[in-house]
From Swiss-Prot:
This is Uncharacterized protein YpjA. InterPro entries: DUF1405. Keywords: Cell membrane, Membrane, Transmembrane, Transmembrane helix. The keyword Secreted does not apply. It is a multi-pass membrane protein. GO terms for cellular component: plasma membrane. PANTHER family: DUF1405 DOMAIN-CONTAINING PROTEIN, HYPOTHETICAL MEMBRANE SPANNING PROTEIN. It is found in: Cell membrane. It comes from Bacillus subtilis (strain 168). The keyword ATP-binding does not apply. The chain crosses the membrane at residues 32-52, 66-86, 155-175. The gene is ypjA. Its main location: membrane.
Length: 185
């Protein structure tokens, strides 16, 4: 089962970086690591899955994966529904992105009982995630949705709160001592 999840996430990660390629070609080098949001989230998760296959945990990558899988999974769902609301149309790729990104968020939550990160790992993931918001919305490096350009201020504000929600959810699911921890193998 882990091999299948790994393979699906690998393909999604490759497709995600391909989707960002036009924007990456125009991005200043200092921002490159922060531009491809969703594929970077699944990239973190790929390393978590590889660690699981070796019967290990990778706490910092687990924290980064959970926070960013939830955040960017839900963000992409919201953006595609916003495109539909603004334009009245959504191509089939938009529906594919809704399904695949919702699955990203769900898999982060489903695997969270196996994660072993601490408050400090989560704090680092929180700084990464909030810093990414700053890069996206203060330096205009956010994913390019030209039909939504009139709403960037509101999208940026909502994205900040989505980051806070994702960080809080990760705290509740993993760091909180009340949660049951599971072993994968």
């Amino acid at each position: 089962m882990l091999i299948l999840v790994l393979a699906i996430n690998f393909l999604g990660t490759v497709y995600g970086y391909y989707w960002y390629l036009p924007q990456l070609l125009e991005t200043p080098a200092r921002f490159l690591i922060f531009v491809p949001d969703s594929p970077t989230a699944t990239f973190f998760f790929l390393f978590v899955l590889l660690a699981f296959l070796m019967k290990r945990n990778a706490p910092l990558l687990e924290a980064l994966a959970l926070v960013t899988l939830v955040k960017y999974g839900l963000w992409a769902v919201a953006m595609n529904f916003l495109v539909l609301a603004v334009t009245g149309d959504l191509p089939w790729e938009g529906y594919m992105l809704i399904a695949s990104h919702f699955a990203m968020a769900v898999q982060g939550v489903l695997y969270s009982p196996y994660f072993r990160f601490s408050f400090w790992h989560l704090a680092i993931a929180a700084v990464w995630t909030l810093h990414n918001d700053v890069i996206d919305y203060l330096f205009d490096m956010m994913p390019q949705y030209s039909m939504l350009s009139d709403y960037m201020t509101e999208i940026g504000y909502g994205t900040f709160w989505l980051s806070i929600f994702s960080i809080a959810l990760a705290y509740f699911l993993v760091v909180s001592k009340k949660q049951t921890k599971l072993e994968l193998m």
